[in-house]
Each structure stands twice: as structure tokens, then as C-alpha cells.
Swiss-Prot record:
It comes from Sus scrofa (Pig). GO terms for cellular component: mitochondrion; succinate-CoA ligase complex. It catalyses: GTP + succinate + CoA = succinyl-CoA + GDP + phosphate. It is an enzyme of class 6 (ligase). This is Succinate--CoA ligase [GDP-forming] subunit beta, mitochondrial. The modification Phosphoserine is found at S162. Substrate binds at N309, G366, I367, V368. Keywords: Acetylation, GTP-binding, Ligase, Magnesium, Metal-binding, Mitochondrion, Nucleotide-binding, Phosphoprotein, Transit peptide, Tricarboxylic acid cycle.
Length: 433
């Protein structure tokens, strides 16, 4: 199996596609909290989902005070305890708290130490390589039984469009970055395509368990866990269930030690209980505000605001701004069923950002009615007293009516004939300042 495709399937296939290479430089300086473009759950929530569906995980409790953490550690009555700060960002183990405590993951055999550490975690910000400099506030900790791992493997279930369905991806080398394994030892990556109608076959689960290196009774146990993980994957409308490590203990137990679950946002209507667990406290406030009006907002570090319909067009708009020497301040996707009120709210969000020095509207009207966009723009400009340059490029449904609305508005709106023209004018409007 070629290394690159496997690596992509293992970790990147279902990542948000909002950023192409030209945007990576800006992406590293995104002005937001923990980057999220899909529903993610905290570690303890994912483990509870797995446990409730028969998947073997370590025993744990969740605490939101130091006293609760201490009592949880006592109730576990374990030989060793692991205390984990619960935030959505990675790199917790090497993070630093605003309290001065180093590390968001700690091992101890003493319940009293758990209480002492929790005092320095809960209510304080934890900064990691994936958080803003100031870090993210920790509201909860997970107090879990620390199990010895005699062997670590990797297992993931992905919804792979190229295979028209779910795919099992596994490797006997777990506990490490799967991309590294795929690049250095591609022969250690194994893949099983699953017919979504027939479901996972016993033979597929057994073969994957064997490829992961489980032997004897452990092989049957691993195969059973794989099938339960697949059933969970379908039941909760996941797009990815990644277990790393998927390991075995010296006592002969197959355990899912850590898991990441991504969900299909389109399934929210039938997964209400799961989506109700979404922790929005780590989002940028403006992103939460945008979601109230069905707007998809991603903050970037530039000064040209982008107001676009459709993720693909938004990517192209950000790219062409870069190519013309500018930097996008955001990625704002209006979507399909547009109302004037949405346009107004979008402008309200954009103009509230002090970084924004110009706004570029780029709309291709298929389902979207350009006239509605134009009316929303003129209303927003008047009521919000727009003070930054506005460049508008419209194409598609009712575009001539829309252009007349803008032209006759008497507002200082710069029209553009195409995307290239729009980007050049937006960049030029900022450069003049």
C-alpha cells in the first residue's frame, strides 16, 4: 500500500478541507481558540460512548473540582492513577498551566496527589502547541485507572469516499504518529474495505486482528472489539473513529486506551444527544455567534474579510487574495438558503473584527439569489455605517437585478467583473491606506 495515500486515509482524509497550501502560513497564525471545524468530544465523552457500547476502556471518573478528583481517585482503588486535563487540543502532556504546573497528564499512586494536582489544573489555562499562547481554560479532569500496556497497535475506521464506504486501517505499530509509520514502514499499514450494506465480516475483523499481531485468545478478543467499534461507528454517524493505542495489557486484556471520534454534522438531526455534548467554550466567540445564523466562520490573521457562498469558492477566494499579495482575515461561508438577515449578520460579524480593513464579497448564485445578497449588503452598509472599503463580485441568479441594486444605492461599493479583479481591488484598497 503506498505510504502517502494510507497516511492521508489514516489521519487527514476526513479533516476539514478549508485550507489549501497557500493558506498554511496564515493557518499557523489563526486567531481563534482550539481549531475545530466539526463536532469533537472531550476524551471522557468519547470513552463513555465506547464503554456504553461494549468497547473495553479503562475505568475512569470525571471531576470538576479538586475534591471530586480526590474522591474519584479513592473510589478507583487502582494501583496507579492517571490524571488528565480535559481540553480538545492535543499536546496536553507537554503543556504548561497558568498556575505554573507543567504537564496536563500526570501519573501517581497516591490519591492525595491527585487532589493536589487537580487544584493546579481546574480553573487554570493550559497552553499546548495547539492552543493560543494564553492557553485554554480547564473545567474538568479525568481521573482514570492507569493500565500497563504490553503492546500498542493502531486502529481506525474511516468513511472513505474513494472506497465508497467505511474502511478499516490498522498497524501493529501503535502509540506513534500513523503518518510516520506509513512513510517509513508502509508494509505495516493494513486496510480492509467494508461493504456498508453487508457490514463488517467476521473474517475481516479476524484478519485485521491477526495483522495487528494479536495471538491466540487475544486475537478473538481484538476481533470482537473491532466489530464493536465498527457498530459504534455506524450507530453514531461517525466519519472517523481512531484508537491509538489499541493495546493489550499484561493481564491479557485488549483495551482502547485513547480515542478520537469525528462526526457527520449532517446527522445532527438524529444524533441530538451526542451533539448536545458539544463543548463550544473552546471556540472563538465570533464562531459561536456565526453559527446562530447558519454561517460558517473561521478566523484568520489577515486584514481582508471574505464573505463567500460555498467552501470551495471560499478556498479559492482566500487563495487568490494571497496570490495578489493580500491576507484574508477570515473564511466565512454563507451557504445555500440565504436570507437578507443572514447577510446583515455576516457584515455585523465582519465589521466587529478590528483587524478587518476591507471586505471582499464573492458570490456565485446558483441556489443563492444575488438580488437578496445585494439587498442585504445595502441594508448592512447603511445601518452599520460601513467604514472600510467594500468590493463586491456577483455572478449567477438575478445578477443584473443585483448589480442595479448596488449601482443605484449611492453607497461607496466597488464592483468587480470576476474573482481576479475582485482580489486585486480588495488588496489595492488596503495597500492605499
Amino acid at each position: 500500500i503506498p505510504a502517502a495515500p494510507v497516511a492521508a486515509q489514516a489521519r487527514k482524509l476526513l479533516r476539514d478541507l478549508a485550507f489549501r497550501p497557500p493558506l498554511l502560513a496564515a493557518r499557523s497564525q489563526v486567531v481563534q481558540l482550539t481549531p475545530r471545524r466539526w463536532l469533537n468530544l472531550q476524551e471522557y465523552q468519547s470513552k463513555k460512548l465506547m464503554s456504553d457500547n461494549g468497547v473495553k476502556v479503562q475505568r475512569f471518573f470525571v471531576a470538576d473540582t479538586a475534591n471530586e478528583a480526590l474522591e474519584a481517585a479513592k473510589r478507583l482503588n487502582a494501583k496507579e492513577i492517571v490524571l488528565k486535563a480535559q481540553i480538545l487540543a492535543g499536546g496536553r502532556g507537554k503543556g504548561v498551566f497558568s498556575s505554573g504546573l507543567k504537564g496536563g497528564v500526570h501519573l501517581t499512586k497516591d490519591p492525595e496527589v491527585v487532589g493536589q494536582l487537580a487544584k493546579q489544573m481546574i480553573g487554570y489555562n493550559l497552553a499546548t502547541k495547539q492552543t493560543p499562547k494564553e492557553g485554554v481554560k480547564v473545567n474538568k479532569v479525568m481521573v482514570a485507572e492507569a493500565l500497563d500496556i504490553s503492546r500498542e497497535t493502531y486502529l481506525a475506521i474511516l468513511m472513505d469516499r474513494s472506497c465508497n464506504g467505511p474502511v478499516l486501517v490498522g498497524s501493529p505499530q501503535g502509540g506513534v504518529d500513523i503518518e510516520e509509520v506509513a512513510a517509513s514502514n508502509p508494509e505495516l499499514i493494513f486496510k480492509e474495505q467494508i461493504d456498508i450494506i453487508e457490514g463488517i465480516k467476521d473474517s475481516q475483523a479476524q484478519r485485521m486482528a491477526e495483522n495487528l499481531g494479536f495471538l491466540g485468545p487475544l486475537q478473538n478478543q481484538a476481533a470482537d472489539q473491532i466489530k464493536k467499534l465498527y457498530n459504534l461507528f455506524l450507530k453514531i454517524d461517525a466519519t472517523q473513529v481512531e484508537v491509538n493505542p489499541f493495546g493489550e495489557t499484561p493481564e491479557g486484556q485488549v483495551v482502547c486506551f485513547d480515542a478520537k471520534i469525528n462526526f457527520d454534522d449532517n446527522a445532527e438531526f438524529r444524533q441530538k444527544d451526542i451533539f448536545a455534548m458539544d463543548d463550544k467554550s473552546e471556540n472563538e466567540p465570533i464562531e459561536n455567534e456565526a453559527a446562530k445564523y447558519d454561517l460558517k466562520y473561521i478566523g484568520l490573521d489577515g486584514n481582508i474579510a471574505c464573505f463567500v457562498n460555498g467552501a470551495g469558492l471560499a478556498m479559492a477566494t482566500c487563495d487568490i487574495i494571497f496570490l495578489n499579495g493580500g491576507k484574508p482575515a477570515n473564511f466565512l461561508d454563507l451557504g445555500g438558503g440565504v436570507k437578507e438577515s443572514q447577510v446583515y449578520q455576516a457584515f455585523k460579524l465582519l465589521t466587529a473584527d478590528p483587524k478587518v480593513e476591507a471586505i471582499l464579497v464573492n458570490i456565485f448564485g446558483g441556489i443563492v439569489n444575488c438580488a437578496i445578497i445585494a439587498n442585504g449588503i445595502t441594508k448592512a452598509c447603511r445601518e452599520l455605517e460601513l467604514k472600510v472599503p467594500l468590493v463586491v463580485r456577483l455572478e449567477g441568479t438575478n445578477v443584473h437585478e443585483a448589480q442595479n441594486i448596488l449601482t443605484n444605492s449611492g453607497l461607496p461599493i466597488t464592483s468587480a467583473v470576476d474573482l481576479e479583479d475582485a482580489a486585486k481591488k480588495a488588496v489595492a484598497s488596503v495597500t492605499k491606506k
